[in-house]
Structure formats: structure tokens, C-alpha cells
Amino acid sequence: MNKSSSASTVPPHSTPHTAHSTSSSSLPPLSSTHHTNTSSTSNNNNNSNNNHNHNHHHTTAATTTTSTTGTGTTAATTSTSTSSTIPINTAGIHTSNSNLATATNTPSSSPQVSTSVERRFWMNDRGSRRSSTSLTQQPLTMNRSSNKLHAAVSARDLTRLKQRLSQPRKAKIELAEYDSMDQTPLCAALRNGSHDIVREILFFYQSNKMDINDQDKSGYTPLHVAASHCDDQILMLLLNYEGINVNITNEDKNSALHYFCQKFRSPNCQEPFSIFLKKGVNVNAQNKNGETPLHKSIFNNTVRLLMVNMLLDAGAEVNVLNSRGESPLHFAVRLGREDLVSVLVKAGADITIKGNEKKTCYELSLTIGNQRVINFLKNVQDIFNWLKSIDLEQYWLNFVKEEIFMDLLLDIDERTLDSLGITYSGHRLKIIRNCRILRDQQLLSTANSNVTTGSGSSGSTTTTTTTTTTTSGCGGLNVPENKKVTQLSIESLKSNPPNSMDSTGSISSDDLKESLTNLEHWVIDHSELEYTLKLGSGSSGKVYKGLYKGKEVAVKVLKSITTQSQLEEFKKEFQIMGSIRSQFMVTFYGACIEPKLCMVMEYCSRDSLYHVMNTKKYDIGWDRFFQFTMQMTLGVQCLHNWTPQIVHRDFKSLNLLVNEDWECKVSDFGLSRFNTADNLETLSKIRGTFAYCSPEVAVGNGSLYTTKSDIYSIGIVFWELVTRVINGEYSRPYSEYSHIKMDFQIMLNSKEGLRPTLPQNTPPGLEALYKQCVNQEQTLRPSCEEIIETLNRLRHEYMSSKTTWDSLIRKLPSLSPPPQPTTTTTTTTSSSTSTNNINNNINNNNNT
């Protein structure tokens, strides 16, 4: 669809945009109103209008005939006060229009306009540019060399600081003085990131009733500085300070939240943000350019998607317009981020809004050229136009939120309408009827195409279908069978032995920094990472979904390392993951040291094997059982055959991750150890989850954790999978024993020989393999090679007797609705029975 056709089909808004050109486009008015630029009226105590000699002098945004100089003096300006278009580069920085082609590889016809919106670091003449959220950088001429508090802060000398603070009269005077960077001692400490020093100064402020909300000449408070420069721990010291005012704005009308949303870098942004909310922050405050915190969050290069989602959850208005008539959606389109565009549209962003460039977001996306953004916005407009054609456009957002676009209308059924929240029977019938019309039209079109190309025959209709190989282990998911590991043998492993380290078997005892220096090619610059979604948390830290060099990754952010033992844990996991390369292990991309310790790994979209087994919609059969058990055993074998040998020590279904292609991979090596003389002490400690812990380790008498301890854990995961396949639902190990209620009871009973009980109709070969793996005597447990050999033999047995094996599976009641009677001469089959299945089968659904 071209631009002109797009514009011509969009209906007018019910509410016109004040001071902005209105659209004649076809998307509906939304419940949220379009806000024009109305600067926030939040508290701004004692905000001085005196010029402040910083690099962020306030300049009026105006069309210029002569460029603005670095001192903030404009050679010539018109009397009109407007801000310029805000194109976006790949770093998320507002740029001038002259650089739009550089940022987006597309030409720009808009005139270059001087503005105060986010331009620093884009041009080489950085001193002549300043951001509406840029803090003080250039020094003043005054020098407070006699200020002992400033000297202590600069030297990060906590002892000298305490000594000076012990003299309240002098300290109060010095705390109010500015240094050569025109900052108070508190602001200097905030910029330096000195947690203990900040805490001491704040305690002095509180004890002496000093004003924590005191503003400098440009209106900045300590909270502005902290929100822009500090990590989560220091920022929360300010936010938790009694009497802190989170809504004070500076001369550019930016609140601390504007800075926080644009500049905060830590993935732990939820905690400080929640304190902002508790303090009554205005999430819709607009600065002088009309930008809200939601606008600003688009420019956060590290946690932008996390920020956007938090703001939307907190009630941020998605259709607030800045002085250029642009909403946050325009910013996301310029950035070329389909994920951001999707989140904003699903939150109700109106794609028909036209900014000063007279373009809707879809038209703007065509000039930017990002195909994924273009496709998404076109899908949104197409589904709306179709719903409008049947007078049901009020449901367009229901469809968009579930990503039910035109290509999936053919598969809509009653259950899909339930998931869309469409309850009115007349509307449901109308949608189903019109979807059937679309289906018949497609069949007719296909038939005519076949006749034209000679693929059809007279009097008959031939529909071309795409056949996808599926496994019985996935039911209706239509997941392509993984052919890499369905028939692996010991011989193939011998021909491709695992790699080995070049070391002599000893592990370096150097500190973390030296370890990373030795593996410096694994060190990742934190600026190359972006966090997009929190996936979970555990005892060792939090895990986020993110982006690294444009690739989806998982980022494991470790908790602060305060002890030597924690340092050793990180070093071991880093060394192990940096040493091993195997298709059966989660790929390791590298680690970051600052500002947070984190490890960057392959992202496995289906979560852990534990979560896969707990998801009832997944029909896990014997094919999937053999695939998973083979892959996990090959992963453990890779560890056991390494030089020096590695034992996992925490093998369980939660530490087996499943990617989009249904490949099961071993992960989480935080407890893993190289099996060397240096690690004898740690190998004798009880580690791992109790149900998966072998009895010799559970006894706690100092027995070494060996490779056979890992084999025991493999046996317990085998039990989980066998039980899930046969019973059709997940059960926890030992859950059949009513007398076992506590974890320690599992350990006591396992050392007495008690084991989880397999279903009665378990195939004898699988039962024998399970019992070998969990044998009380570790020397009688099989090796990984023996397990693989047995699995290959049992899989061959299954392939030869599929009917017999499948008859052992207990059939659960069908979740599908009963078949509807056929009312037409043409029978149409839909392979999707739910919205989730529709989304999973975009490329696999065929109608015959």
C-alpha cells in the first residue's frame, strides 16, 4: 500500500490536535486524548532565572539564519519559538535534521533548525550543542581550594570527610559552596559514585535540617544529578530521604524522572522507579519541548524497553505530543525499533497522528526504511481497515494486542474470539462469517492461479500446501523435527571428540581482573548491551532478555560480590563457559565488569525444560523425550570428557534451557567445578537441589562429588520426562510420598534408598535405565556414553513399535472445541484452535 492510499483511507479524529495538523487517516480515535505541549506545573522551588555559566545554557529553540555559538549566543533568530524535528540515530541521541541521512540512511528534506533537544555528542563541536537533559559539565572560573569538604570528596577520603562534618558550623558553610565544576560537595559525591561519602553527607543534611531540595542557578537539585549519574544504590539513598521532592523541575522544566528515564543504566531500574511512584512523581510531566519521561525513555540505550514498559504500567499517557506534534511512537519509528513500536501501539498509540512533517507514523516509517517497522504498522492499518469495512473497528486494538492480522483471519474460530475478549454474539457471528468469505476468496484465487499456471486441471481445484515434518512429541505445535540429534551414536562422538583446554589441568588462582585479562577477548563493553525484559531472578542474581550487537541474548546480572567465595564462584563460571564450545551447551558471548558484573549468553526463548514440562499446551511425546534426554546427556558428556574434567554439580530441569528450535541445552555453571586436586574441598560440599542430589553427597560425610553424582541427577530428570510423557502433566520428584513435606526429608530418605516412582506402564527398557542412573552405589551407575548407547537402542525400539509405545500414554481430555457441523459444500480445515497456536503457526497453517 503506497502513501497516498494509506492517507486516503484514514478517518478524521474525533478530537483535533491543537496547534498541529490533523490527520485524515483511517485509524479510530483512542480513549486516551492527544496532549499538546503544555509544560508541567509541578513544584519548582526557588528556580532562578539568572544565567548559569554551564555548557547547558538555555537557548530558545528557533529557526536560525546564523548558527548558534558555543556560548549560547544566537547570531540571529526569528521571533517564533519552536523546537526542531528530532531525528534519531542508532545511539538513541536526538540529532539535527542535517544528520538524519546519517542516522537512518534516508534523505531528509526538513530544514535544519536550532533546538535544545538532545544533540550533544552527535556533532564534533560538542561545546556548541546542549541537551534539554544535559547536566553541568564546564567549570566556572571560581575555585574553592580552601573548601576541605570538596577536597575530601575529590580524594574519596571518607576519614577526612567525617572529620570535617564533625564541625557542623564550618561544614554547613562548605556544603553550600560550589567547586570549580560549579557543584556542591553533595553533587560532586553523587557524580563520583561514592556511596559511603554520599551516605555520610545525607546523614549530616538530615541531622542539621539542611534543604535536600536546594536548587542551583539552573534549577538542578541533587536528585537531578543522582538520576542522571548514579547507580541504583546511590539513587535510592536520595529517593528514600525524608522530604525529597521528586517533582521539582529545572529551567528546562525537566524533572528528575526525565533524567532517570533517559540516562539510568542499571537493569535494576524497577526498584528506584517504584520509589519515584511512592513519592508521587508525575509520570506525564512535560519539559519545555513538550517531552514526557516516556519520550525520554526512547533514548535510553541500555534499558529503554524496560523503562517504556514501567512507565506504561504506571499510567503514562502514550499519545502526549511534544512541541513538534510528535508522540513517543514517532520517536520509536525514527529509531527503527519494531519492539518499541509494537509495545506503544498495543498500549494505544495512535498511528494516525501527523507531526510537523505532515506524516503519519506509517508514512514516516517509509522514509526511515526499517522493513520490520513498516510491516508491523502496515499490518495494524490493514486490520483496522478490514474491521472498519464490516463496521467493527472498535475491536482493532483487541486484534493488534494479540497480533491477529490479515494473514491469520482465515484461522479465526470461537476460541480465538474468546481470547480476543469479543463477547457480543452478533459481532462474533459477523466476524466468523466475514472470515469465511475471506477464506473462500483465497481458495478461488488459488484455483484461478493454478489454472493459469497449468498446475490445475479442468473441473477440479488443486490447492498447493506446504508440508512441514512434525514430531508426535509436539502435538499441534507443528515444530519441525530436530534431525541433528534424533539418531546419535557413540561412533559419531568418537569421530568428533570434545575439545580440550591447552592447560596442564591446573586452574589459575589469580583474581577476577587478571582472569579476565587472560581472556580479554571475552570482555564485553557494557555500552554494547541493552536490557529489554526481566526473565527471572535467583540466588545468584537476575536474568534479563537483551540485545548484544543486534542479537537477542540472555544477560545474567550477578549480585554484588562482597566475599572472596562469591568472587571465586564468578571466576569459575566465567572460566568454564569461556572454555567450552558445544552445540549442547548454552553459547557464551562474554562478560561485563562495570557497572554490574554480568554474563552474556545465548537466549533460549522457551525457558527451562522445567517450564516446558509445566506448560500444559505442549504435547510432549516419545519423540521429544528421546530428543531432550539425548541432548542433555550429550551436554553433560561434554563436561565429563573435558580436560581437565568438569562436574556440573547442579544438574536439574531448571538448568536445562530450550531454544526456539526445541534444542535442549545445559546451562548454569555457577556450581560447576573442574575435577582437579585444587578443588577437592569444594567437590565434597553439598551443592545442588535436594531432589537431584545423589545419596552419597546428601549423606554429608565428605564424599566427593563425581561424574557419577551428575549421572544420578540425569536419572531424576529422566523420571520427570517419563512421568510427563505418560501422565500428560508434570509432577515433582517425590511428590507421590505424602510423608515427605520438607527438602531435608528428601535427603534423609534418598540415602535410605527411596526414589521417585515411575508410572506403572513405563517401558521396561526405560525403567531399567532410570534405575541404573539412580543406583544407590555410584560405581554401578552408567557413564554418559552408556546412557547414549541405551537411548539409541530404546529409540530404535520405539520407532519399530510406535503404536505400542504411544498406547502407554494416558490420554487427557481434549481441550479443542467439538467439531462444528458442515453447512457448505466446501470443507475448510483450520489447524489453529487458539490465539497462541495461531501465533506459533504463522508459517505452518494451510487450508485445504
Curated annotation (Swiss-Prot):
<dbReference type="InterPro" id="IPR017441">
    <property type="entry name" value="Protein_kinase_ATP_BS"/>
</dbReference>
<dbReference type="GO" id="GO:0007165">
    <property type="term" value="P:signal transduction"/>
</dbReference>
<dbReference type="InterPro" id="IPR001660">
    <property type="entry name" value="SAM"/>
</dbReference>
<protein>
    <recommendedName>
        <fullName>Probable serine/threonine-protein kinase DDB_G0278535</fullName>
        <ecNumber>2.7.11.1</ecNumber>
    </recommendedName>
</protein>
<feature type="region of interest" description="Disordered">
    <location>
        <begin position="810"/>
        <end position="848"/>
    </location>
</feature>
<dbReference type="InterPro" id="IPR000719">
    <property type="entry name" value="Prot_kinase_dom"/>
</dbReference>
<dbReference type="Pfam" id="PF00536">
    <property type="entry name" value="SAM_1"/>
</dbReference>
<feature type="region of interest" description="Disordered">
    <location>
        <begin position="448"/>
        <end position="478"/>
    </location>
</feature>
<comment type="similarity">
    <text>Belongs to the protein kinase superfamily. TKL Ser/Thr protein kinase family.</text>
</comment>
<dbReference type="InterPro" id="IPR013761">
    <property type="entry name" value="SAM/pointed_sf"/>
</dbReference>
<feature type="active site" description="Proton acceptor">
    <location>
        <position position="650"/>
    </location>
</feature>
<dbReference type="InterPro" id="IPR051681">
    <property type="entry name" value="Ser/Thr_Kinases-Pseudokinases"/>
</dbReference>
<dbReference type="InterPro" id="IPR036770">
    <property type="entry name" value="Ankyrin_rpt-contain_sf"/>
</dbReference>
<dbReference type="GO" id="GO:0004674">
    <property type="term" value="F:protein serine/threonine kinase activity"/>
</dbReference>
<feature type="repeat" description="ANK 4">
    <location>
        <begin position="289"/>
        <end position="320"/>
    </location>
</feature>
<dbReference type="Pfam" id="PF12796">
    <property type="entry name" value="Ank_2"/>
</dbReference>
<dbReference type="GO" id="GO:0106310">
    <property type="term" value="F:protein serine kinase activity"/>
</dbReference>
<feature type="compositionally biased region" description="Low complexity">
    <location>
        <begin position="60"/>
        <end position="85"/>
    </location>
</feature>
<keyword id="KW-0547">Nucleotide-binding</keyword>
<feature type="compositionally biased region" description="Low complexity">
    <location>
        <begin position="95"/>
        <end position="116"/>
    </location>
</feature>
<keyword id="KW-0677">Repeat</keyword>
<keyword id="KW-0418">Kinase</keyword>
<dbReference type="GO" id="GO:0005737">
    <property type="term" value="C:cytoplasm"/>
</dbReference>
<dbReference type="InterPro" id="IPR008271">
    <property type="entry name" value="Ser/Thr_kinase_AS"/>
</dbReference>
<keyword id="KW-0040">ANK repeat</keyword>
<keyword id="KW-0723">Serine/threonine-protein kinase</keyword>
<feature type="binding site">
    <location>
        <position position="556"/>
    </location>
    <ligand>
        <name>ATP</name>
    </ligand>
</feature>
<dbReference type="InterPro" id="IPR011009">
    <property type="entry name" value="Kinase-like_dom_sf"/>
</dbReference>
<dbReference type="InterPro" id="IPR001245">
    <property type="entry name" value="Ser-Thr/Tyr_kinase_cat_dom"/>
</dbReference>
<feature type="binding site">
    <location>
        <begin position="535"/>
        <end position="543"/>
    </location>
    <ligand>
        <name>ATP</name>
    </ligand>
</feature>
<feature type="repeat" description="ANK 3">
    <location>
        <begin position="252"/>
        <end position="285"/>
    </location>
</feature>
<keyword id="KW-0808">Transferase</keyword>
<dbReference type="Pfam" id="PF07714">
    <property type="entry name" value="PK_Tyr_Ser-Thr"/>
</dbReference>
<feature type="domain" description="SAM">
    <location>
        <begin position="378"/>
        <end position="441"/>
    </location>
</feature>
<feature type="compositionally biased region" description="Low complexity">
    <location>
        <begin position="1"/>
        <end position="52"/>
    </location>
</feature>
<dbReference type="GO" id="GO:0005524">
    <property type="term" value="F:ATP binding"/>
</dbReference>
<keyword id="KW-0067">ATP-binding</keyword>
<feature type="compositionally biased region" description="Low complexity">
    <location>
        <begin position="452"/>
        <end position="472"/>
    </location>
</feature>
<feature type="repeat" description="ANK 2">
    <location>
        <begin position="218"/>
        <end position="248"/>
    </location>
</feature>
<feature type="compositionally biased region" description="Low complexity">
    <location>
        <begin position="822"/>
        <end position="848"/>
    </location>
</feature>
<feature type="domain" description="Protein kinase">
    <location>
        <begin position="529"/>
        <end position="799"/>
    </location>
</feature>
<feature type="repeat" description="ANK 1">
    <location>
        <begin position="181"/>
        <end position="212"/>
    </location>
</feature>
